[in-house]
């Protein structure tokens, strides 16, 4: 009997504790859930596999729209912008840089010029001349949404096809020339050694052409002329190396080259 009573009492105590724990367990998850959702400092909210904040879907959709709206940038084309209406300081700004900065123009004679790399398409722009925004009346204009008059330029790929073709042709010609220089000339080839004949060893050198006998360094300089200046040489005398007669144990070498309309004669003195 004593054991039965003690078991009943201990069972009632355990039943009360179990009921108390069940009651506490029924309300605790709700409170913990409210704290986790309302508090951004609780790190467990990010560890739950099924928990997503309400703005996650909106952020993902916004990011997807942003990625879809990004398009590959078009090729920039060098475009010449010119201002011919005078002024001291001229700048330009337009839709190509979101009107954020003013690009200075360089003065060339009576005009102001700038070369800008603009993508293909239409662009609005305006000049900032001596502190005032103005447009060029000689160029196409358009009225913006704010009612201001801006210049309009249309950059088209077809306008640069000639330059692209010339650039491509230049690259191909340079590659061809390099390939021709590196390759051997056409013709038969063999491994036979050339045998010199006895009469070839004692053959006299070729006769010097008569037009190469008139070396300008051997000519007497006129008294009225500047001794540092030489007479204009004949075109057949260019790009030749001349050795003058040895005098006072000094050998003189000379060569004449032409640069456009100027002639330069170089002298090399070597003691012997």
Swiss-Prot record:
GO CC, one annotated term: cytosol
Residue positions, PTM Phosphoserine: 39, 69, 95, 108, 158, 170, 174, 184
Stored Pfam families: AMPK1_CBM, AMPKBI
The keyword Iron-sulfur belongs to this UniProt entry's keyword annotation: no
Chain positions with Phosphothreonine modification: 40, 148
Record's comment on post-translational modification: Phosphorylated when associated with the catalytic subunit (PRKAA1 or PRKAA2). Phosphorylated by ULK1 and ULK2; leading to negatively regulate AMPK activity and suggesting the existence of a regulatory feedback loop between ULK1, ULK2 and AMPK.
Xref: CDD domains: E_set_AMPKbeta_like_N
An MF annotation (GO) of this entry: protein kinase binding
Name of the featured protein: 5'-AMP-activated protein kinase subunit beta-2
Species name: Homo sapiens (Human)
